[in-house]
């Protein structure tokens, strides 16, 4: 039996976005002074606490409390000014899609009871990377420029597949994209170019584009492959109007950095 495909999902945030496999690195040419030049320290008067409390730092990322997100543990430590950043195509779940999930989850829980639904749904175009706060807006502008020429398109995600993250600490049930793969590759190519400009980790060489539906802590791929996977696929295939339900319009690319969202409409 082949192992479950790897998928990068981060351990923080409500949507379990792509996992950062490399910590944020300094942008080339920044953060250093020339040899022979000694930086001259400047003295600053201390700011009263009463004033500081009025202006909370805008560089501070979201609070890192694993108890608030299912006990998941960050793969990379939270540091002041570092923001987990993820690029994806959002999918807005309608009532019919929720009905499909209501049929799939109980069946999957017969094999792995600890499975829970994702809080939101998307197709990832990047891994999760660590971006410095002052790079967010320049990075988003580069992304917008690269996305400007892309047309909106339809894709179909109807193949049930089991995924794990690289550390095998979490398992996901997803619907793999069966049509529209070429358009996703084109988008990833441009996202990767933006990543390289900021010395960030690019996406996987042979990505399996998908919408994650449910997840659990730990490696449950052995329990979910085989009989469970077959039964889940039968539910999808036999679900009323599943062909139309799982044909999705990709009309925007979204970037989430910390608790900030940036949307880039496709033409």
UniProtKB/Swiss-Prot annotation:
Listed GO CC annotations: nucleus
Residues annotated for AMP binding in this entry: 122-124, 204, 206-212
Compartments (UniProt record): Nucleus
Chain sites annotated for binding UMP: 166, 204, 208-212
EC number of the protein: 4.6.1.-
Active site residues of this protein: 122 (proton acceptor), 210 (proton donor)
Enzyme class, first EC level, given as a word: lyase
One term of GO molecular function: lyase activity
HAMAP family documented for this protein: USB1 (MF_03040)
Purpose of the protein: 3'-5' RNA exonuclease that trims the 3' end of oligo(U) and oligo(A) tracts of the pre-U6 small nuclear RNA (snRNA) molecule, leading to the formation of a mature U6 snRNA 3' end-terminated with a 2',3'-cyclic phosphate. Participates in the U6 snRNA 3' end processing that prevents U6 snRNA degradation. In addition also removes uridines from the 3' end of U6atac snRNA and possibly the vault RNA VTRNA1-1.
Similarity comment text for this entry: Belongs to the 2H phosphoesterase superfamily. USB1 family.
Protein name, as recorded: U6 snRNA phosphodiesterase 1
Gene this chain is encoded by: Usb1
């Amino acid at each position: 039996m082949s192992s479950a495909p790897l998928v990068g999902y981060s351990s923080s945030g409500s949507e379990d976005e792509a996992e950062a496999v490399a910590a944020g690195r300094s942008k080339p040419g920044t953060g250093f002074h020339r040899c022979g030049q000694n930086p001259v320290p400047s003295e600053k008067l201390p700011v009263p606490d009463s004033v500081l409390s009025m202006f909370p730092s805008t560089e501070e990322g979201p609070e890192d409390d694993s108890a608030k997100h299912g006990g998941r543990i960050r793969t990379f430590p939270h540091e002041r000014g570092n923001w987990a950043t993820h690029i994806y195509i959002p999918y807005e779940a309608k009532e019919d899609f929720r009905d499909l999930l209501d049929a799939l989850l109980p069946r999957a829980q017969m094999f792995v009871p600890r499975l829970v639904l994702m809080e939101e749904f998307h197709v990832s175009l990047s891994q999760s990377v660590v971006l410095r706060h002052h790079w967010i807006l320049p990075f988003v502008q580069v992304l917008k420029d690269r996305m400007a020429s892309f047309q909106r398109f339809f894709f179909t995600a109807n193949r049930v597949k089991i995924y794990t993250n690289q550390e095998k600490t979490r398992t996901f049930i997803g619907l793999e994209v069966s049509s529209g793969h070429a358009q996703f590759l084109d988008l990833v190519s441009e996202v990767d170019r933006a990543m390289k400009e900021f010395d960030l980790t690019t996406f996987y060489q042979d990505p399996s584009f998908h919408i994650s539906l449910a997840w659990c802590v730990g490696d449950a791929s052995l329990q979910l492959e085989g009989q469970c996977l077959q039964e889940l696929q039968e539910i999808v295939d036999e679900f009323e109007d599943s062909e139309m339900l799982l044909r999705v319009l990709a009309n925007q690319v979204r970037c989430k950095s910390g608790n900030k969202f940036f949307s880039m409409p496709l033409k």
